[in-house]
Amino acid sequence: GQEEINQIMLDNFIIAMDPPKHMKYRKVVRDAFTPKAVGEMEPWLRQHAKDIIDRVAARGECEFVEEVAAELPLMAILEILGVPQKDRKQFFSWTNIMAFADDPDIATSLEEAQAASFEVIAYAMALAAEQRKNPTSTAVQALLNGEVEGEKMSEELFAWMFILIMVGGNESTRTAIAHGMRLLMENPKQLQYLVDHPEDISQAVEEMLRYNTAFIAMRRTATQDVEWNGHNIKKGDKVILHYHAVNHDEDAFGDDAMVFDIHRHKRIPNLRGEIRSFGVGEHFCLGMSLARLEMNIMFEEIIPRLRNAKLAGDTTYMRSYFINTIKAMPITFDPQ
């Protein structure tokens, strides 16, 4: 039943592991996501970002989430995991169903979400067998050959790692790109500033990450009694980490922390170091360098080419207590 499935996920998901087990597993996959490994993908990412905008530029309108925001993160994660690009739409659908089982438009039931995760597990196991015979993906090789305490990674654990990288690696970045675009359209002066000053795009990306974090919250369990800032937290208590709260902290970001401002870095020089969108501590986001690079490249392509972008129709959101996702966001712009 559901209890057993939850337990299997907790046992196998690296985000739910404690030290020292967590670091042993994290090390296995870490090398595929180092700044150096990610940096080598830059030409590939730029070419695909250009192609994505090429596909919509002449039309003067698009559904920004599926046609633009979702494309590059999904393509990149499939490339890293050695999955053929032709399977991309299938993974877009599976990812939505697994991450948003609670949304009636996406999945009709929890069973449907479980079915999607089992399909991905079956796919991952077949991919593992194929990659053992015919290695093309460095990340998959690292996972398959990685050893934890002298034992090779099991196919089952590989499959759970695959799901985590797949969902974590495309859903969150798609959300950050969609929110970033929405914020720029709601602040046309700031958008125009970036058209005129493309060198400031990378700092604008940090403000996007701060202002609308992809993940809403994570939950942790206290392992011992602790007093923190006058609060008594008992062993076994659940502690919720709210990313939006910490990213809007006036002490860190100034009195206008509730305002979206791409110039914030001029007042808060260490903006990048202060934001907690990627978490903090030993569980910090493995894909941080990849997400930042994808966002920078996408906005460097979007901003000069999709001019006078405006919201056209309703922006709809996923029903989720976990991910702050825009489901659909139709926009118009000057045809190119």
Please identify what each model-predicted range represents.
Residues 1-336:
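Cytochrome P450
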